[in-house]
Amino acid sequence: MVRAGDTLKRDSLKGDTLKGDTLRQETAMNRRHVLNMAAAMAAGLPFWPVRAFAQPAGPAMTALSAYMSSAARRALPAEADEHAKHHLLDTLASIISGSELGPGQAAQRYIRAHGGQGSATVLGTKLTASPVDAALANGVMAHADETDDSHNASRTHPGAGVVPAALAAADQLGCDGAHFLRAVALGYDVGVRVVLAMGGYEFSYDSSHAAHSIMSVFGGAAAAGSIAKLDPKQMRWMLDYAAQQSSGLVAWRRDKDHIEKAFVFAGMGARDGVTAALLVHSGWNGVDDIFTGDDNFFQAYAPKAQREKLIEKLGERYEVALTDIKKWTVGSPIQAPLDGVDLILRKHPFEAAQVRRVDVHLAPASAAVVDNRDMPDICLQHMVAVMLLDKTASFHAAHDKPRMLDPATLRERAKITLVYDEELTKLLPVRVAIVNIELADGTRLSERVTAVRGTIRNPMSRQEIVDKARDLLVPILGRDKAERLIETVYKIETVADIRTLRPLFQPEH
C-alpha cells in the first residue's frame, strides 16, 4: 500500500532536486524554442511552439492512483465503515424522495424521451437506462432538494454525485456490497480532496467555477473507476477524462426551480464521472498526470492550488466521516438558524403570534445563498417563518411552494431580518448563526449555534439517520420495502451483487 505520508516525505526530500531539474529542463526548452523560432523565421516558414507531449506522472498522482486502484481490496476502518453506511442510506433516501419532486420529474421526462437503452436502475421509478443516463437522472434526483449530505470544508455535496455514479457502474459491471461501499468511500476521498487542493471553501466562494460539480465529477469517477477495477495507470487516465469534463458555473444561484442546481451539483458530475470510468474501461488511454505539466487542470482552474492536499492523510482521514448529514431538509446555511429557533422554542416555548421581531445573523457569503430565494427550501426567511408556525420544519413544509404565498406565513416572514454579519466570516468554514427573538412583551431570547445537529461536531445518531430515511422512503416505497432497504444498507457487506437490490429501489406500482 502506498502511504500518502511516505510519499509526501519523499517529495519533501526530493524537492530541491526536482526544482533544479525542472529549472534546467525549462531553460533548455526555452533555448531550443528560441533557436527553432529563429530558424523558422529565417526560412520564411510558419512556426508553432514546441510542446513536451509525453510527460510522466508526478509523485502525488502516482500515490493517488495507486491508492485508488487498491481501495476495493482495502477494508475500511470501523468508524469509516459506519459513516459510509450512514451516508449511503441518506443518499439513497434523497434520490428516492427526490423522484417525486420537480427536478426528479424533469430527469424522468428526459429518460423517457431521450435516455439510452440499458438496464441501470433509475431509483424511485420502474425506469431503466444506460449507466450514463441513469447516473444523470439519479444525481439530479439526489439533489432535487436540500436533503442530501454536505461537506463543510470543501462546500460540496459529495453523496449526490458519488452514490449515483457508483450505482450506475455497479449496474453495468457488477459489484458486491463490500466493494461497493469502499468505492463510495473512495469517491468522497478523491472528489473532496481535489476541491480542497483547489482552495476548499475559499475557492468555492471566490471563483465562478462550481466546486460542487468539480467534486461530483472526480468523486463520481473515482467510485465508478473502483467498481471497474481500473489499475493505477488507468486511474490516471480516468482522472484526465474527469478533468476534461469538469465544468459548472455558480450561475446556478439564479435557478428558480432547483433543476439546474440539481444538474450542476450532482447529475452532471455523476454522468461525466461514469463516462470517464467507462471510456477507460473500454480501452481508451489519456494523459498520465492531468494535475501537473503543461496546461494542467490546476493551472486552468486554480493556479494557487496545493497539490499535496490530493494525498494529504489519504488512508488515514476518510472524508465520508467528515461529511454532514442534514437534520433539516433545507439549504446548508439555513441549518444553523433553524437549530437556533428550535433550541429557543425548547427552552422558552411561545406562539408565533407572540413574536415581534426575529434577527438572524449569518456570514455574508452564507447569507447571500439563502436570502429571500424563490424556492422554499433555500429561502431563510420563509423557513424561519415556517418554524415559528409549525414548531418544526418538515420535508413537506420545505417543499410546499404554494405556502410561500400563504397570508399567515407571509405575516411571520415580515418579522424576520437576515443580518449580513462580517464578524461571522472570521469563523468560516464553520457556519455560525446567531438568532435573536424579541417577543411582544419585551422578552428577548437569543441562541448562538456553532455546531448544527448532523455536523461532524454534533452528529446524528444511527437512529436519527434511520428515522430521517424512513420518513423519506415510506411514502414512495411503502413501509415494508423501506424497512428492508434500511436493514440491507447496514449489512451491505453480505450482498453478493448490488444489482439484486433493484426491487428495493423501486415502488410497487
Which residues are covered by each model-predicted region?
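Short connector loops/turns at beta-strand edges and beta->alpha or beta->beta junctions
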Residues: A142, G161-V163, A168, Q244-G248, ...
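Hydrophobic alpha-helical hairpins/lids featuring a short glycine-rich hinge
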Residues: D149-V192
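Terminal-appendage/accessory-domain detector
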Residues: N30-R155, R254-R271, L278-H509
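Well-ordered alpha-helical scaffold segments within catalytic/enzyme domains
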Residues: S97-G98, A166-L173, A221-A228, A276-V280, ...
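Well-ordered alpha-helical segments within folded domains of soluble proteins
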Residues: G159-L167, S216-A223, A270-T275, A336
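N-terminal secretory signal peptides
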Residues: M1-N30, Q55
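Hydrophobic alpha-helical transmembrane segments of integral membrane proteins
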Residues: H33, H83-A84, H157, G161, ...
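Glycine-rich, mobile lid/loop segments that gate access to catalytic sites or pores
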Residues: G174, A178-G269
